[in-house]
């Protein structure tokens, strides 16, 4: 019975300067790298990362010339082969260190918010990967608190993992949606500690 850290979508397009930037994302990326450096292999048996990785996600992107509604349609972001899809430079030391055991890409041809919708390079889901390594407890960090962190943590709990969100290591898009997400997570039995960065 082991514990894993799930790092959600710490990517260029979700940090300052990106096409769907979340204020505080770059600082959160650096803080997550510090956590990974201090705890990989000790507090956490495994560290995994998720990544938005869009090829042609259909209506997930707002049509050219139209404003996205920021609920079901979004600006173009994290397109495969672009700089925006890459992990943020502040997270690069964690990746370069070899501490990230697997990366789960999601959303190639449709909208995907939860890391549990993604697949690793071998086509394995996050739930399968964690179970095959006897992981029973997960801590979730990353971007954005009110979207992909929320969805990943809810799915982790639904999949039967004891789930904890380290809110100090998350960045939310807006206060209202973040508050709503936190209430939803509490109701689902997800343990929450700290306070998210919110613009």
Describe each PLM feature range.
Residues 39, 147-158:
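Histidine-anchored nucleotide/phosphate-binding helix
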């Amino acid at each position: 019975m082991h514990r894993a850290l799930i790092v959600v979508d710490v990517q260029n397009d979700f940090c300052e300067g990106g096409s769907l930037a979340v204020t505080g994302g770059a600082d959160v990326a650096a803080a997550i790298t510090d956590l990974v450096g201090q705890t990989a292999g000790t507090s956490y048996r495994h560290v995994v990362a998720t990544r938005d990785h869009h090829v042609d996600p259909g209506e997930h992107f707002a049509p050219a010339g139209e404003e996205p509604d920021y609920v079901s349609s979004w600006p173009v972001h994290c397109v495969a082969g672009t700089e925006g899809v890459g992990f943020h430079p502040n997270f690069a030391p964690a990746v370069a260190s070899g501490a990230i055991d697997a990366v789960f890409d999601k959303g190639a041809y449709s909208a995907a918010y939860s890391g549990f919708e993604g697949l690793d390079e071998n086509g394995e889901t996050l739930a399968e990967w964690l179970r095959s390594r006897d992981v029973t407890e997960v801590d979730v960090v990353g971007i954005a608190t009110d979207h992909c962190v929320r969805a990943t943590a809810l799915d982790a709990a639904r999949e039967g993992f004891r789930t904890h969100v380290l809110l100090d290591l998350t960045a939310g898009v807006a206060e209202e949606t973040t508050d709503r997400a936190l209430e939803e997570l509490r109701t689902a039995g997800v343990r929450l500690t700290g306070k998210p960065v919110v613009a």
